[in-house]
Amino acid sequence: MKLSTPDISDKYPEAKALKPILKNLGGRQSFFGPIETLKCPDDNSFVKEQLNSSGDGKILVVDANGIDTVALLGDMIAEAGVKNGWSGIVINGYIRDLDIIGTLDIGVQALGTMPVRSEKKNQGEVGVDISFGGITFKSGD
């Protein structure tokens, strides 16, 4: 039996829902799995590193503080996520290469699109608690 998000919300009233700030931008409209968290406001070095590692059906949840001056995900990094078995990517920030990412078999949710790539400063924090959209995300949830 397939459950929709409203069905899950009805069945588990204690479950919290993210405020409707993100858009579905990937080729897979629904996805699930344990999460890995990442905080990196304007540098996608760690996004690339994580998606180039084995995903085993996980979801990468990235807090970019909603920064709208650069994109943290492009087609090549998203393709690495598909190749390495990630179920999805959720970004409190922006992506680029929508025409390609929208065809990939991976869930992608983000605030929108921005064509400018991020700098590569190798900055970020993996596995830390992050909060956005009224939800706190913890690695392993």
Model-predicted regions and their roles:
Residues 1-138:
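Feature captures the catalytic cores and cofactor-binding loops of soluble hydro-lyases/lyases
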